[in-house]
Amino acid sequence: MKLTWLGHSCFAVESGGYRVVLDPYYVESYPPLHTSANEVLCSHHHRDHAFVEAVSLTPRKDSPFTVQTVETFHDDKGGTLRGTNTVHVLAAEGLRVVHLGDLGHELSGEQLAPLRGCDALLIPIGGFYTIDAETAKRVADAIAPRVVVPMHY
């Protein structure tokens, strides 16, 4: 499995010649994103996480990934300020990658269960519309991944 940071909260995850792009962005202060993928997954529908126009879709073939989702919120007020956020868990080659999107709160035990012990945790740390670094540390400690990759800072 290959994991590539493309900017902001956008990553490409590849396995067996199949490429998934997570949270493609349009942010005026960042270089434009131009990439290709077999599949695009978005945590929520704000253009800094769901600018699918930046991704050229290549013909789909059978995906080596299994994808699990965990519903969370984009804020710490049950989604009343910024709505929902979908966490994606991608598994292939015996590895699991968790992309937390624009997580805005600490996770419940039920939300943590499918994330615990993942191989790579992609976690927002910026504190602006997401959890901050201190909260991110608590979330990461609860998930206990092999590797933590900060994003959205």
Roles of regions detected by a PLM:
Residues 1-39, 46-50, 56-120, 128-134:
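Core dinuclear metal-dependent hydrolase active-site scaffold
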Residues 37, 120-123, 127, 136-153:
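Proline-aspartate-enriched helix->loop->beta-strand connector
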Residues 43-45, 151:
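Conserved helicase ATPase motor motifs in RecA-like P-loop NTPase domains
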